[in-house]
Amino acid sequence: MVSAIVLAGGRGKRMGNIQSKQYIDLNGAPILYYTLKQFIENDLIDKIILVVPEDEKDYCKREVLNKYGLKIDDLVSGGNERQESVYNALEKLEKSDIVLIHDGARPFVSQKIINYAVEYAKRYKAAAPGVMPKDTIKIKDSNNFSVDTLVRSELVAIQTPQAFDFNLIYECHKEIKKRCISVTDDTSVVELLGHKVYIYEGDYKNIKITTPEDLILAEYFVKNIV
């Protein structure tokens, strides 16, 4: 069984918006609608779990799932941090073989990216899409002076969905929970415990909508791509 966990817990602080970013309107529908639709329409995905803050569950059911006829398998309460939300969802997936973990604020994930996530997770147990940074990346010191310039061809900006053998990611999450280790994404979870992640070619259109500038780009994409 292949399962997808969609994380929709962003509060939209960088948007300057009181409304959670996954519910922001994008050409007549909330951002989360487009994200869920991509996974619902994918033939490789057997089960979908959506994670939202406890106090938004009723709103999400009413204004997203029911309003747009989106069928998922479970709606799970998120935690205070991203890794807690992932852990809560993993606990609902006892019989999965592969699990994909995706940001709800990435509505332009393609079917190709999802398919590759499943394929490479089966082959390598851990995989994620990534793109080369377009800008030169430097390391700076505490006084804001440059210290070093990194080799751009060796760098990659990791996207989602990040895909894993279920037992691997679940056991790794249990271990970092026990050790009280904080991480920013799920590839870091398995890497901290000695497992390599296969990185395949991502898509520059697979943006995470985080800032007002991202929303401008998203509005263009939804009118010209979706």
Curated annotation (Swiss-Prot):
Recorded metabolic or biological pathway in which this protein acts: Isoprenoid biosynthesis; isopentenyl diphosphate biosynthesis via DXP pathway; isopentenyl diphosphate from 1-deoxy-D-xylulose 5-phosphate: step 2/6
Keywords: Isoprene biosynthesis, Nucleotidyltransferase, Transferase
EC number(s) on file: 2.7.7.60
Pfam families: IspD
Site annotation Transition state stabilizer: residues: R14, K21
InterPro entries in the record: IspD, IspD/TarI, IspD/TarI_cytidylyltransf_bact, ISPD_synthase_CS, Nucleotide-diphossugar_trans
Domain of life: Bacteria
Positions marked as site (Positions MEP for the nucleophilic attack): R152, K208
GO molecular function: 2-C-methyl-D-erythritol 4-phosphate cytidylyltransferase activity
Disulfide bond annotation, renumbered to this chain: none
Gene3D superfamilies recorded: Spore Coat Polysaccharide Biosynthesis Protein SpsA, Chain A
Biological processes per GO annotation: isopentenyl diphosphate biosynthetic process, methylerythritol 4-phosphate pathway
PROSITE patterns: ISPD
Reactions catalysed, as given in the entry: 2-C-methyl-D-erythritol 4-phosphate + CTP + H(+) = 4-CDP-2-C-methyl-D-erythritol + diphosphate
Family membership noted in the UniProt record: Belongs to the IspD/TarI cytidylyltransferase family. IspD subfamily.
PANTHER family: 2-C-METHYL-D-ERYTHRITOL 4-PHOSPHATE CYTIDYLYLTRANSFERASE, CHLOROPLASTIC
Function in brief: Catalyzes the formation of 4-diphosphocytidyl-2-C-methyl-D-erythritol from CTP and 2-C-methyl-D-erythritol 4-phosphate (MEP).
Protein name, as recorded: 2-C-methyl-D-erythritol 4-phosphate cytidylyltransferase
Organism in which the protein naturally occurs: Clostridium beijerinckii (strain ATCC 51743 / NCIMB 8052)
Gene from which the chain derives: ispD
